[in-house]
Regions:
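PLP-dependent amino-acid enzyme catalytic core
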Residues: 1-310
């Protein structure tokens, strides 16, 4: 039987789980969902497709229309990919502090890229995206930080995939918080199926907004903008673990060197948070699932892999 996708968007999802054998400690049962297997190499492919599907269904996005979005990078890449496949113009606004690889990939998909002052964080990018959209007839803002189509993608697909692939054997789920859509959607599915699943959110220690701290610069690209997004459901999270940028970098490097998994900085944060949880004696016989959001290839120019070119 032929298996041919109609467009690249049909390749999104059904990413694999792999056992983590070394970096989170010995004698623990940890598996990771590797989202780099999506066509644009990140978990953001999922909600980009979901947001565009919803905008098409509502009539807000017409053929030949324009999609505008503020992003730290991966959502911009994903929207640019799906937009290219469906014939939309795409304008991506991101802080200039994001990696050069992210910028280049957005442009490679034919999208327009607008860079904002890093001092303003993602909030400044959001304001600029709103200004651009207001001046372009037929433009919509994807609004990943407020759009219910974001967590809906993970309720419909990501969470169900994890449950199916583990045959319902999930005791703990650990994930970083960027928009919050991934952890909120996955947690909703897992909690509906088993209310005892323990949900752990990972945040940058330098910007501990989820535990009442103040926003501050940090180096974990993709985690925690300088505000708590509407798409994050705090009520479904049981615990928050804070991870230093340096620790996230260390775990991402170790994932490549010890597991053969070339992943990004936010994946390092997820693994570091998982290691904290997995070290607890009461979880020795429990299955812990984490999610690795993207590939390390778009961080080769950053501090994550500094010095490799020598």
């Amino acid at each position: 039987m032929a298996r041919i996708a109609s467009t690249v968007a049909d390749l999104i999802g059904n990413t694999p789980l792999v056992r983590i054998n070394h970096v989170v400690g010995d004698g623990v049962d940890v598996v990771a969902k590797v989202e780099a297997f999506n066509p644009a190499s990140s978990v953001k492919d999922r909600h980009a497709r979901s947001i565009i599907d919803a905008a098409e269904a509502s009539g807000a996005l017409a053929p030949g229309g324009t999609i505008v979005e503020a992003t730290s990078g991966n959502t911009g890449i994903a929207l640019s990919m799906v937009g290219a496949a469906r014939g939309y113009k795409v304008v991506i606004v991101m802080p200039a502090s994001m990696s050069v690889e992210r910028r280049a990939i957005v442009r490679a998909f034919g999208a327009e890229l607008v860079l904002t002052d890093p001092k303003g964080g993602v909030s400044a990018a959001v304001a600029e995206a709103e200004r651009i959209a207001s001046e372009r007839p037929g433009a919509i803002i994807a609004s990943q930080f407020t759009n219910p189509a974001n967590p809906a993608a993970h309720i419909a697909h990501t969470g169900e995939e994890i449950w199916a692939d583990t045959e319902g054997q999930v005791d703990v789920f650990v994930a970083g918080v960027g928009t919050g859509g991934t952890i909120s959607g996955v947690a909703r599915v897992l909690k509906d199926k088993n209310p005892n699943v323990h949900i752990v959110a990972v945040q940058p220690a330098e910007s501990p907004l989820l535990t009442g701290g103040s926003p501050a610069p940090h180096g974990i690209q993709g985690l925690m903008p300088n505000f708590v997004p509407d798409t994050f459901d705090a009520d479904i999270v049981d615990e928050v673990v804070s991870v230093e940028t340096a620790t996230a970098l260390e775990f991402a490097r170790r994932a490549a060197a010890e597991e053969g998994l070339l992943v990004g900085i936010s994946s390092g944060a997820a693994l570091a948070g998982t290691a904290v949880v997995a070290a607890r004696p009461e979880l020795a016989d429990k299955k812990i699932v984490t999610l690795l959001p993207d590939t390390g290839e778009r961080y080769l120019s950053t501090a994550l892999f500094a010095g490799l070119e020598d």
